[in-house]
Regions:
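A short glycine-rich beta-alpha junction/loop motif
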Residues: 11, 113-121, 151-174
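Acidic/polar-enriched heptad-repeat coiled-coil alpha-helices
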Residues: 180-184, 195
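Non-catalytic DNA-recognition/assembly elements of restriction-modification systems
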Residues: 16-42, 65, 165
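Short amphipathic coiled-coil heptad-repeat segments
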Residues: 1-24, 192-197
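Short, Lys/Arg- and Gly-enriched loop/turn segments at beta-strand edges
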Residues: 100-108
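Sequence-specific dsDNA recognition surfaces
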Residues: 32-46, 59-90
Length: 197
C-alpha cells in the first residue's frame, strides 16, 4: 500500500506518495558523488574482425526498455580490450542526438557484461544509491534534462560535466529496495499489456 503525505505545512525532502512504514526524510547528493560515470567508444570499423564476436556493444538507439540483454552489434574480445567492460546491473543512457524525442531521456540497465558506444554514458553505484533507483529517477526527469541542458547546434548532447552535477534525493537502502521492486513489477505489467495490444 502507498499513502499520500500532506507536506503543506512541513517542507520535507520526500515524495507525496510513499509506503506508510517509511517516515525518514530523504537525503540528497549529486550524481557524481554517488556514481562512477563512464563514456564509451567505437572500435575501428576498418578492422572488420572487431565486429565479429559475442561481446555486447550498446548504442544509444537500443535503450528503450528497462533491461538490455543483448546488443544489435557484437564486438570481439580483442576490440573489447580497449573499452570499459561494464558489469551486470550498470545503468546506461543516451547522451548524443537528444534533439530526437525517441532518444532523449532513454536508458536501460544491463543484464550482461557490456561495452558502450561514445553516444552513451554508463553509471555504476558507489554504494549509497542503487542503479535501479537512478533508472527510475531518470525515467521521470531524463526528457526534461535533455531539453534544458543538452548542448550543441545541430546535434544536442549531454556530457559528464553536466550530468555529474545533478542532485538526487534518495531514501535509505530498505526503502530503495521496496521502491525498485514495485517499479520493476509495474514495468513488467506494462510490457505484458503492450504485448497483448
Amino acid at each position: 500500500m502507498i499513502t499520500t503525505i500532506n507536506n503543506k505545512h512541513k517542507k520535507l525532502n520526500v515524495p507525496n506518495l510513499r509506503f506508510p512504514e517509511f517516515q525518514e526524510e530523504w537525503e540528497e547528493s549529486s550524481i557524481g558523488e554517488m556514481f562512477d560515470l563512464y563514456s564509451g567508444n567505437t572500435p575501428s570499423r576498418l578492422n572488420k574482425s572487431h565486429f565479429k564476436g559475442n561481446v555486447n556493444w550498446i548504442s544509444s538507439g537500443e535503450l528503450k526498455q528497462h533491461y538490455i540483454y543483448s546488443s544489435k552489434e557484437q564486438i570481439s574480445e580483442e576490440a573489447a580490450q580497449s573499452l570499459k567492460m561494464l558489469p551486470v546491473g550498470t545503468f546506461v543512457i543516451a547522451i548524443y542526438g537528444l534533439e530526437a524525442e525517441g532518444v532523449r531521456g532513454t536508458g536501460s540497465i544491463t543484464k550482461e557484461p557490456s561495452t558502450i558506444s561514445q553516444a552513451c554514458m554508463a553509471f555504476t553505484s558507489k554504494g549509497k544509491v542503487e542503479n535501479e533507483f537512478l533508472y527510475s529517477w531518470y525515467k521521470k526527469h531524463g526528457n526534461v534534462i535533455g531539453i534544458k541542458y543538452a548542448q550543441g547546434t545541430k546535434q544536442q548532447n549531454l556530457s559528464y560535466d553536466i550530468l555529474e552535477k545533478f542532485k538526487i534525493a534518495y531514501p535509505n537502502a530498505k526503502e530503495q529496495g521496496k521502491l525498485n521492486k514495485f517499479i520493476s513489477l509495474l514495468d513488467e505489467r506494462i510490457a505484458t499489456q503492450n504485448k497483448i495490444i
